[in-house]
């Protein structure tokens, strides 16, 4: 038993050592502030777990992402953190998830028939790969490591089931698939890999009864997930065929950028955008892989397994490029690197099959020496690159440096200047953002706040109104406009805007309190009634 667990334990320890510095990282202000700081009132309470399945992951009124198990994981961390200022439990969980995935990957590769040494080195390569830094060092990156954890548990369960024809393992496979689906919607692709897996590894098909139960189990999971998700995700966020096509036209090059970055991790960015990187490296790699696949076609088993690996990679990556986030201008969709985490498992299988086919025992020592050298280089790069996530200032400086064409990156760097009390630097950075995208959300509203703090109320009001025109769902624009109108004694207008702000973000009571406050002098009786109604 000790020998069996020595190598996987080594992987887990190395994962912790490699990413230990991230335990003390702060907020990046890319989603982590929304998921943890802004929502701590929810995830830090008992509701964080009991109501996770009835909310979207951001607790947003424009719900898009139904990922309840991500919320549950954050709620567990919040229990230990006790405060949104303590991020250590959140980062610790991210490291533990990565270590667990690497250990499961080791067992998965062995289950597919690869030797212990090959499985260990392959898992170690996955562990240190710089493309996965964002999945570990950035708190929201756990989307993908948690997804990988449940997918690997599911596929291992199915492999055990195919060997032992056990109802227990069949049930475990279905349950862990359900956990994956309730973690991230891209898990819906996973059942498409079950039959290719059976064929590629010459597994004996189970009896019809098992197949029928498996199909019914998967369909039940889909149905339960679909109903639960439909009750949370608003219908206006559904995607049309036209939307898919438009997104693909603007984002297709991301497939090649991702591929190139996975094979040779250069030109990395904490905030890469579609039109900011050349796909040439990925196109070249793709052409080479197609040629290799064509060459392998004569050896059926290797060909099928290599094809399975590429199918896995493509199935989990294509959804990334088929959706356009309406928060970004076309061509400025962000293609974050953590999304490579799950697809890369398939690519690893493809590369292992190529390695097995072309391996020459005479050169075996050279092969493993080269792999060891790559692992050392990748580990060093990961150690350095991880520090890009150390703080919000470092993060957005790196984002602008590596994605200078991103209006969003310039906007958020400006916001960091503004939070740090540097309005002049913030204003300049906001103007840079507007040069790239004249209607970048939040920019006019934040410029309005700078004008307000300078005492230029007329310009501030114009900027707030412009923000509302561009971004009518931005509650802070209404809140800040309401504050300005209170200063000008325009109470009726202020009440209208403050109430709108409250309706847009009901969990943020600042606008509601200010709305009620406007009645304190003019209508004390109504003030008392509203106080009693909303703040008993």
Please provide the spans of the model-predicted regions:
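Canonical positions in the second alpha-helix
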Residues: 399, 432-433, 466-467, 500-501, ...
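Register position in tetratricopeptide repeats
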Residues: 419, 453, 487-488, 521-522
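Terminal, low-structured helical/coil segments at or just beyond the last alpha-helical repeat
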Residues: 512-536
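Polytopic membrane enzymes that build or remodel cell-surface glycoconjugates and lipids
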Residues: 1-453, 476, 480
